């Protein structure tokens, strides 16, 4: 057992999977929608979500899902906020339909989305104490200060850098003197605006028509290179506090801090970049 009460477990022998009654949550959505005679349509929606789980199950095999589970007290793994939830999400849609070319419809549409970031965990960067065989998944012990009796800083500079990082984030400093629970911090908020312009051209009186469209996805990012980014944490784990194991008294040997560990700008599904698309469809 280490100085803060964390158990040190040996390498795993067998992995046993069973169901649990812990965890759960809710999702609440409200929306308003209105169309006007002048061709304007409006939609606004808000979703509030709270989901808790015991294991994120981020891998295809149970052994690696076990190993990639951030933990602080050995096999005691309480339910925590899910890695896949966004607590707040706002959706705003506006459209305007008019006739510019004869009696053919021209539609201008804007879609805006703003949502809070997914939760992530703060762990140690260094050798594992939890027996999973995978480094970087020990939930970090948060020092109370430069003289915390449960840690040994490599130098005064390291102590000051670590404490500056801890005190800069309320989601971390709130757990000073303890092992921080899983998924206490959040990724930054994300937002984007998409624009679509469609033009219909009727082909006779039989209902056939050509529909051309012009899309700008992530208009935010096109207008400003510093906007429209989706910043995430890889596998929802930030190995922010570096350690070189523990001494004979069970005190953590803290060697540094990496405030940006595992942060990246996601490009999945077109995030963090702008795109322009043209298209033509024939409808009949």
Report residues per predicted region.
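Short, solvent-exposed micro-motifs at the edges of structured domains
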Residues: 1-284
